[in-house]
């Protein structure tokens, strides 16, 4: 029964089609589709918590997908309690990565809760989870279980280390994967200790890999009519992101080291202390180096035999950086910004967050997104990084309260009657947050 329902929803939902046209779904005239977001009509069942998974599903929601976030009654996503800071009782951490989602609070340790999740999976296009491998299978919600009732499903599993292997049973957190992948080894002062990056880059990179993989899965299903399983993990994501640093070791047998703000293969490319702050510049070729020298009024460095090529500048890094540092320290940051403006040299100050969100280009790019939260009122979060010509990314629904949409989803999506919903509420299998 669930399998038949899944097939009907997957391939007969309005706006869907399996062939023809330019878009993924072809059930509407092309003129109507031009202003639609590309994932309108796609439904995501989101069992993820914390950052990597919620970041992936938020990006999918930004593109028009309906995201149903499944949370534990009483507690919800772990990040709901992460703080301070809080706004009233809402964690700003949670608010940052959960816009454009609906929350249903369901106890998936109860068989009745498992049934609800399965019923939702049958009418969803994508199932995303970030449990330790095997945990959801124990509850009857593993890929094999969902595939039986929803063979169209794109099932994305986000873990710490992968589905198999000697570490697959371990829980995964950003800092641990950052350490084990080598990222922490190459981050920090040149002569200092390893440093955790200031934002959870491993989680975020994994979320972006999962986001891209889910999009690829939907395209694959468009071609084949079949779902698939996606194995995405923190360790693999971060090792893949080592790129040229990894290649230096794998091809050149060169062990990586920490460079602070500097670059191991390009000089000068780092932060320099000014009279009142820091300025980062990058000279990636000889022409750019010559321009930097002219701006700094150090033209004698251009033809110095020790600095004529990048290779020589890397060899003589310490001496050159000492000369440049002394010059940068003579003026305030604002003066250097004026001198570098229009030069063609990549440059910029090291900004505090106050500086970031008053930066003209940040505001111009629409990177501050405002929403009206049901209990907090107006909130601002970082907006989407990408813009599109055919549809707007500025309109967003605020992050949900825990269980805010439980009753709505059961009644309007799964067609439960009021009696069945009340029974589940009374038994604690589900939870509804009533907004005023």
Curated annotation (Swiss-Prot):
GO MF assignments: succinate-hydroxymethylglutarate CoA-transferase activity
Active site: 203 (nucleophile)
EC number: 2.8.3.-, 2.8.3.13
N6-acetyllysine: residues carrying this PTM: 392, 423
Transit peptide: 1-8
Major subcellular site: mitochondrion
SUPFAM superfamilies noted in UniProt: CoA-transferase family III (CaiB/BaiF)
PANTHER family assigned to the protein according to its UniProt record, in alphabetical order: SUCCINATE--HYDROXYMETHYLGLUTARATE COA-TRANSFERASE
Listed name of the protein: Succinyl-CoA:glutarate CoA-transferase
Gene giving rise to this polypeptide: Sugct
